[in-house]
Amino acid sequence: MRLYELVLIVRPELSSTEIDKLTDELTSIISNYEGKLVKHEYWGMRSLAYKINRNQRAHYIMLAISANNNILQKLKNKIKNNLEIIRSRFIKVKEISQTTSPILKNQSLEQTAIDVTS
């Protein structure tokens, strides 16, 4: 099985429970066909570089998976038919880092930064 990172951009109107449900649907496809979810990260609500379907912001989700071509086709079909997902991208990787992704590290640094301008 090959390693992939799947990045999803999801509509901003979705609640956290709806996002969890969407993620569970995708992970169940992976596990039903003997794939493996290696890592899951929710990157939060982020601004888009440009409007996509009238959306300025969206939820970002990253799934790192071990999967074969059959699983990839099932996931692509599920994603294609799901109106909640604005964009998706499968990226083939050689290995999956177990550390926190740089996006989440930057997010946590921004939250802990002290505002010295006031």
UniProtKB/Swiss-Prot annotation:
It comes from the Bacteria. GO terms for cellular component: cytosolic small ribosomal subunit. GO terms for molecular function: small ribosomal subunit rRNA binding; structural constituent of ribosome. Transmembrane segments: none annotated. Disulfide bonds: none annotated. InterPro entries: Ribosomal_bS6 (IPR000529), Ribosomal_bS6_sf (IPR035980), Ribosomal_S6_plastid/chlpt (IPR020814), Transl_elong_EF1B/ribsomal_bS6 (IPR014717). Keywords: Ribonucleoprotein, Ribosomal protein, RNA-binding, rRNA-binding. The keyword rRNA-binding applies. CDD domains: bS6. Belongs to the bacterial ribosomal protein bS6 family. NCBIfam families: S6. HAMAP family: Ribosomal_bS6. Binds together with bS18 to 16S ribosomal RNA. This is Small ribosomal subunit protein bS6.
